[in-house]
């Protein structure tokens, strides 16, 4: 879009992603308003950043594009009660994750364009890369193209975030939602956490010191993941010893075997057919009893107390811990 036809944007939510999106878009020349609850946890932050902050119902009224950047589980009610009744005819509705739309929890008005733009990095990185003249890759999708310009809206928004400086890849709401959930559950969060805890337990139960076990299965994981991030699995293998490489080749498949892969497929099936989302909605509506139980169990796992003591002596982590003190999750509007 040319400068004189750039959409007026309303950002609903001001958590990690919301703040980065709002700041980058404003610095890219867009007219950005932030919609938040009066007295909400991030209202003062948005105001301190120089934004006009109004109620979400007001923010969306004159916006050409409304970006919903609040947690997944509040979006349905927010859309039905606040956004849908107030969005102007023919505007564009944008999501950073497709869960609610793909699984029909949000059914957008027929007159709206509906798109998705998701930077592939946390909000702090999205902002930092933009400020130094680079960008974080973005994926985008079009769910509903009423105006014939939905894709243009998505690409314009992604460009405003800095995504065009890096890479922009087209996807679908289905693909983004299902692969994102699978990655979180089977590998990045659920898979990695369970693997680390199991490895710690095996070593401690075999009589090794918990502190040594912590270093071997958790602390050093960052070194490996950083190499993955920089150049893939083969780069990691280039930087470890031949002994470690051989152990990778012969023991990795013993831990992650065909049975593990089959169970990963089961996880994917539950995501694809909506079982996971149905269960998650029911859990949330019930007040999170199992969620809280699982969370407490993780907090009480022996690796946490050991790690807390060891990290207290890692003085180089102090600045990182302070930066991480703010909630990583996006805040409700």
Curated annotation (Swiss-Prot):
Positions of the KARI N-terminal Rossmann domain: 1-171
Stored Pfam families: KARI_C (PF01450), KARI_N (PF07991)
Keywords recorded for this protein, A-Z: Amino-acid biosynthesis, Branched-chain amino acid biosynthesis, Magnesium, Metal-binding, NADP, Oxidoreductase
GO molecular function: ketol-acid reductoisomerase activity; magnesium ion binding; NADP binding
Residues noted as binding NADP(+) in the record, renumbered to the chain: 14-17, 37, 42, 72-75, 123
Catalytic residue positions: 97
Keyword Magnesium part of the UniProt annotation: yes
Record field: catalytic activity: (2R)-2,3-dihydroxy-3-methylbutanoate + NADP(+) = (2S)-2-acetolactate + NADPH + H(+); (2R,3R)-2,3-dihydroxy-3-methylpentanoate + NADP(+) = (S)-2-ethyl-2-hydroxy-3-oxobutanoate + NADPH + H(+)
Gene of this entry: ilvC
Gene Ontology cellular component annotations, sorted alphabetically: cytosol
Residues annotated for substrate binding in this entry: 241
Organism annotation: Xanthomonas euvesicatoria pv. vesicatoria (strain 85-10) (Xanthomonas campestris pv. vesicatoria)
Textual note on the cofactor: Binds 2 magnesium ions per subunit.
Binding site for Mg(2+) 1: 180, 184
Domain KARI C-terminal knotted, residue spans: 172-317
Family named by the database record: Belongs to the ketol-acid reductoisomerase family.
Keyword Cell wall biogenesis/degradation: no
UniProt-listed HAMAP family: IlvC
Residue stretches in coiled coil: none
GO biological process: isoleucine biosynthetic process; L-valine biosynthetic process
Stated role: Involved in the biosynthesis of branched-chain amino acids (BCAA). Catalyzes an alkyl-migration followed by a ketol-acid reduction of (S)-2-acetolactate (S2AL) to yield (R)-2,3-dihydroxy-isovalerate. In the isomerase reaction, S2AL is rearranged via a Mg-dependent methyl migration to produce 3-hydroxy-3-methyl-2-ketobutyrate (HMKB). In the reductase reaction, this 2-ketoacid undergoes a metal-dependent reduction by NADPH to yield (R)-2,3-dihydroxy-isovalerate.
Pathway this chain belongs to: Amino-acid biosynthesis; L-isoleucine biosynthesis; L-isoleucine from 2-oxobutanoate: step 2/4; Amino-acid biosynthesis; L-valine biosynthesis; L-valine from pyruvate: step 2/4
Name of the featured protein: Ketol-acid reductoisomerase (NADP(+))
């Amino acid at each position: 879009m040319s400068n004189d036809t750039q959409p007026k944007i309303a950002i609903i939510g001001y958590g990690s992603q919301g703040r980065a999106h709002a700041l980058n878009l404003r610095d890219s020349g867009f007219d950005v308003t932030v919609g938040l609850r009066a007295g909400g946890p991030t209202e003062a932050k948005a105001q301190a950043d120089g934004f006009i902050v109004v109620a979400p119902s007001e923010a969306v009224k004159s916006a050409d594009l409304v970006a919903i950047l609040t947690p997944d589980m509040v979006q349905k009610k927010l859309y039905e009660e606040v956004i849908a009744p107030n969005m102007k005819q023919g505007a564009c509705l944008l999501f950073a994750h497709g869960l609610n739309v793909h699984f029909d929890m949000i059914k957008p008005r027929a007159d709206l364009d509906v798109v998705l733009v998701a930077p592939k990095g946390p909000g702090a990185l999205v902002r930092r890369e933009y400020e130094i003249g680079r960008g974080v890759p973005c994926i985008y999708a079009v769910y509903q193209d009423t105006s014939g310009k939905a894709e243009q809206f998505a690409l314009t928004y992604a460009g405003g975030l800095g995504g065009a400086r890096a890479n922009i890849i087209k996807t679908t709401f289905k693909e983004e939602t299902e692969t994102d959930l699978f990655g979180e559950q089977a590998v990045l969060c659920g898979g990695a956490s369970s693997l680390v805890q199991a490895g710690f337990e095996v070593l401690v139960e075999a009589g090794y010191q918990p502190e040594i076990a912590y270093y071997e299965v958790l602390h050093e994981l960052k070194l490996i993941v950083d190499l993955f991030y920089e150049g893939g699995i083969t780069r990691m293998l280039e930087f470890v010893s031949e002994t470690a490489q051989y152990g990778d080749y012969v023991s990795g498949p013993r831990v992650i075997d065909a049975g593990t892969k089959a169970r990963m497929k089961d996880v994917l099936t539950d995501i694809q057919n909506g079982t996971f989302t149905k269960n998650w909605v029911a859990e949330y509506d019930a007040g999170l009893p199992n969620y809280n139980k699982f969370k407490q169990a993780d907090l009480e796992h022996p690796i946490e107390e050991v790690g807390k003591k060891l990290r207290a002596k890692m003085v180089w982590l102090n600045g990182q811990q302070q930066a991480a003190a703010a909630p990583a999750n996006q805040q409700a509007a």
